[in-house]
UniProtKB/Swiss-Prot annotation:
It comes from Homo sapiens. It holds the Pfam family Keratin_B2_2. This is Keratin-associated protein 12-1. Belongs to the KRTAP type 12 family. Disulfide bonds: none annotated. Sequence repeats lie at residues 10-14, 15-19, 24-28, 30-34, 35-39, 45-49, 50-54, 55-59, 60-64, 70-74, 75-79, 80-84, 85-89, 90-94. Residues 10-94 are annotated as: 14 X 5 AA approximate repeats. One of its GO terms (cellular component) is cytosol.
Length: 96
C-alpha cells in the first residue's frame, strides 16, 4: 500500500507502489535508487543521498525531494512544514 500521509511511515513493500495518490513515501530500506510509478508524470528516482524517508511531491515537473538530510539543491530543509517543494528550475522558492 502506498502511504499518502507524510506523517506516517512506509512498509518496504511500498518501494514501488502503483496506486499512488498525490504523494508517497519511499522507505530507506530500498537500496540504491527507487523509481516511482509513471503516474507521477514523469517517473523519477529517489537519490541515495537522501538518507531518511522522503516524500515525493507532484506539484512541480520535474519533482524534487523533501528530506532533512538532503543537500540544498532544490530539497526542502528540516525547518519546512510543507512537502510542497519546487525544483531549482522553478521561479518560485525551492522550499515550502
Amino acid at each position: 500500500m502506498c502511504h499518502t500521509s507524510c506523517s506516517s511511515g512506509c512498509q518496504p513493500a511500498c518501494c514501488a507502489p502503483s496506486p499512488c495518490q498525490a504523494s508517497c513515501y519511499i522507505p530507506v530500506g530500498c537500496q540504491s535508487s527507487v523509481c516511482v510509478p509513471v503516474s507521477f508524470k514523469p517517473a523519477v528516482c529517489v537519490p541515495v543521498r537522501c538518507q531518511s524517508s522522503v516524500c515525493v511531491p507532484v506539484s512541480c515537473r520535474p519533482v524534487v525531494y523533501a528530506a532533512p538530510s538532503c543537500q540544498s539543491s532544490g530539497c526542502c530543509q528540516p525547518s519546512c512544514t510543507s512537502v510542497l517543494c519546487r525544483p531549482i528550475s522553478c521561479s518560485t522558492p525551492s522550499c515550502c
